[in-house]
């Protein structure tokens, strides 16, 4: 097994070479971009722990995300990306990788990158239909990890397969893969079908589901058992349909966690969401990922989402409606209404409502 320290040194060495090679040229070789998201949330106090029967409400405002990215084309076949993330008073490296595209059937990516799992998780936060991703995407779709991956396109099939060493708080190693197929496409209209898997080793590290009900500043009411996990096995299926102004996407995911005592906990969930461009235009699509609106204007959105913790006997559902207004390529406004229901064995159904607003500025 490749050690995480070795992979870290390799990635940092590669980035140093990238920096030297790039700055030896001219500054125009570096593409600097970024964005900032300012959020306001107002929600029932029932979405806070210990306030299940309260009729009060809470309101919060925050910088939800701020990102700064540096991209560089080093040569014909080599390029790099380095992205910093700023949120919750902390700074972290989001992306730090090199990509080689000189082979005919596959591209090679080395460094900190997104694992290939989950249509919604792979969609940039700037291009989401709703302010927040669904519960299942946040709970189980892997995010960014240090690793090495191969990806490519063969006819109408896009694929990615990688070996990763995530943060030790999540897993010690993982093999993750995704295949997406477009069986039908006419101009910008298309049907996308995808499957993905991830086999993750925990080696006794703690695993726990701990998620809010799609309201970022509310409490994490979905709290599963604390498990000293040996491994996690997860699978997902995905669908995306783009038809003129209309967008529909859906996913279903299952996960099984095996403890070091050889007991298992099962989880599953999914979502169905839509978007409709009132002002014309359509949603873009590239590399098996959903893109931004093609034109400025209004978009209405909606989502039904659920998450089930089987052994813990907990269920959560959300119903959301939203409206987005894209002013231009730099400025976007978003507003969502969320109704959330939560049930735990031995208790009653807890419900809450929320309004979430966002101002997004990109450069």
Outline where the language-model segments fall.
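Outer membrane beta-barrel
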Residues: 25-45, 49-203, 271, 276-293, ...
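Outer-membrane beta-barrel pore domains
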Residues: 26-27, 47-48, 53-55, 206-363
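Cleavable N-terminal export/targeting peptides
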Residues: 1-27
